[in-house]
């Protein structure tokens, strides 16, 4: 206990989440000399999405050559689009190479995070009743935070058959000869449906909004290809080319004058829909099904998936695409809105996720910062904002790896590495100054937010106006699109560490008989208005 009677935390850093973000956090913390950290996860092993999602044919719809850390290149992927088991094996290897497993705890669900300003630490309340204390907290819970396992469908609670979500697949259930319904037509269904169709008696697929299913040029990576990727810089060059394509598209979106952008958006949407209709015509035989598959919005409004087998699956006699909507679920059937009732033995709820750009992902009462600041209340009443997508005023010593306006690059790894470079720089600066508390200044947070709005005007127009009605997760319930970072990849990379250190305030723990000297959030907001 120090002279101001503050207590020492159990850990310098606790990382919440042991997926791609948590592994990256552990590696980068060691690089700045921090070994006193703990990584916790609510499930039974590391890997995040790739641990939880073990449904049939689960795999990546991004080329494997780009789906990896820059500090752990893997040249020997089995195929261009890796399957779940090899991705999970890769993550385990990276974690083991950096001695992370001994710093991990599983089956540990944090239900509430409370900041103690007097002791300058976080108290993390576990569902078991345990309390873990940490100087710093890094939230690495991923982009797809909570599976929507109980969608608002009439009668769902009364269903008496077998049901499951792609994030919690029941491997003990034998689908052979069964009547199965899948609700939802996103990326999971794109992979699940072709596998189930060959087993089941009948497969009903319920579609609310048409999705986009792109060609998937998958193939086995031959030994000579793997040798090429293993050459010095081989994987980096291939990844750089892919990043260049993404970067070019971002630059066009950000720098095109608004009138030209709006004209171009209409043209691109029309051409895209026409090209996609041609692709569907090649793959799907039935004219009525083709009509049901064609979106009436631009094909880039939603995150299309690379799923070469899904469209041909709709040609099977035992597969039916149902677009009438769901009227009611009974104990043993689904009645569609047109009155047709179809009996089922099993139900797959591929109904999506709460994502990081949804205010609903941040539950009130779960993250309580300085002076009672409630992150959930803030994000559910204000626009989502965070300085460099990682730091929120009123929440000292806590960082978000996947926050508002964070998504950039070809894959998840790119932007979590950049987020962690920023976080590590802030923690390192705090320790260098001999401080124990760091908090972003409200003025800096608002300045960054306004830059996101200004730089992202073209993207916002497209997503929030032209994509209305697409049910895209790029657009949240507030009608905003705080998903993509409207910067070039180079700017994102450079700015991660090249920022004004005075955008943060630094101090020690408050003395027990002194008032806390911290930024005034409301005053700063008023000054900026």
Where are the model-predicted features located?
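Rossmann-like dinucleotide-binding core of oxidoreductases
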Residues: 3-10, 14-20, 24-45, 139-278, ...
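Core beta-strand elements of the Rossmann-like FAD/NAD(P) dinucleotide-binding domain
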Residues: 9-11, 127-136, 175-176, 337-346
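Beta1-alpha1 glycine-rich phosphate/pyrophosphate-binding loop at the start
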Residues: 11-104, 207-208, 282-286
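Short beta-strand to alpha-helix junction loop
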Residues: 74-93, 264-270, 297-309
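Feature captures the FAD/FMN-dependent oxidoreductase FAD-binding
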Residues: 79-145
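A conserved short coil-to-beta-strand element within the FAD-binding core of flavoproteins
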Residues: 106-121, 319-337
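C-terminal, flexible cofactor-proximal segment of oxidoreductases
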Residues: 212-215, 235, 239-244, 385-386, ...
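Glycine/threonine-rich phosphate-binding loop and adjacent beta-strand/alpha-helix elements that clamp
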Residues: 346, 350-430
């Amino acid at each position: 206990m120090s002279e101001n009677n503050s207590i020492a935390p159990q850990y310098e850093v606790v990382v919440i989440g042991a997926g791609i973000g948590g592994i990256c956090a552990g590696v980068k913390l060691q690089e700045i000399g921090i070994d006193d950290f703990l990584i916790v996860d609510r499930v039974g092993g590391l890997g995040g999405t790739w641990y939880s999602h073990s449904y049939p044919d689960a795999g990546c719809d991004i080329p494997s050559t780009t789906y990896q850390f820059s500090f752990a290149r893997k040249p020997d992927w089995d195929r261009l689009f890796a399957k779940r088991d090899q991705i999970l094996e890769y993550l385990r290897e990276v974690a083991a190479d950096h001695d992370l497993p001994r710093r991990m705890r599983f089956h540990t669900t944090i239900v509430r995070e409370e900041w103690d300003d007097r002791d300058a630490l976080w108290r993390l309340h576990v569902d078991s009743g345990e309390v873990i204390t940490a100087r710093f907290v890094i939230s690495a819970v991923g982009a797809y935070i909570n599976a929507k396992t109980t969608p608002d469908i009439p009668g769902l609670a009364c269903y008496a058959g077998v049901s499951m979500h792609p994030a919690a697949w029941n491997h003990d259930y034998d689908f052979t000869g069964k009547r199965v319904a899948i609700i939802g037509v996103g990326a999971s269904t794109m992979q699940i449906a072709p596998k189930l169709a060959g087993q089941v008696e009948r497969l009903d697929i319920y579609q609310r909004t048409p999705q986009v299913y792109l060609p998937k040029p998958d193939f086995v990576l031959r030994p000579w290809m793997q040798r090429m990727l293993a050459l010095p810089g081989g994987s980096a060059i291939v990844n750089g080319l892919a990043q260049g394509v993404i970067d070019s598209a971002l630059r066009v979106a950000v720098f095109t004058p608004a009138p030209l952008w709006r004209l171009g958006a209409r043209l691109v949407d029309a051409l895209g829909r026409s090209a996609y209709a041609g692709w569907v015509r090649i793959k799907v035989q039935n004219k009525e099904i083709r009509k049901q598959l064609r979106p009436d919005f631009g094909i880039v409004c939603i995150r299309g998936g690379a799923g070469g087998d899904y469209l041909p699956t709709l040609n099977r006699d035992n597969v039916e695409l149902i677009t009438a909507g769901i009227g009611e679920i009974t104990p043993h059937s689904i009645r569609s809105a047109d009155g047709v009732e179809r009996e089922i033995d099993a139900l797959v709820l591929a109904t999506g996720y709460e994502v990081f750009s949804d205010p609903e992902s941040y539950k009130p009462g779960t993250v309580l910062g300085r002076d009672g600041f409630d992150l959930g209340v803030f994000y559910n009443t204000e626009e989502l904002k965070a300085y460099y997508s990682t730091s929120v005023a009123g929440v000292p010593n806590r960082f978000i790896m996947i926050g508002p306006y964070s998504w950039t690059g070809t894959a998840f790894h790119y932007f979590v590495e950049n987020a962690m470079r920023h976080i590590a720089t802030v923690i390192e600066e705090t320790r260098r100054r001999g401080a124990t508390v760091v908090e972003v200044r409200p003025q800096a947070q608002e300045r960054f937010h306004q830059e996101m709005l200004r730089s992202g005007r073209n993207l916002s127009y497209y997503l929030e106006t032209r994509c209305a009605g697409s049910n895209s997760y790029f657009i949240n319930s507030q009608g905003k699109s705080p998903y993509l970072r409207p910067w070039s990849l180079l700017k994102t990379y450079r700015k991660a560490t090249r920022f004004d250190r005075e955008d943060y305030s630094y101090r020690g723990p408050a003395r027990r008989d002194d008032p806390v000297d911290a930024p005034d959030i409301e005053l700063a907001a008023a000054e900026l208005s």
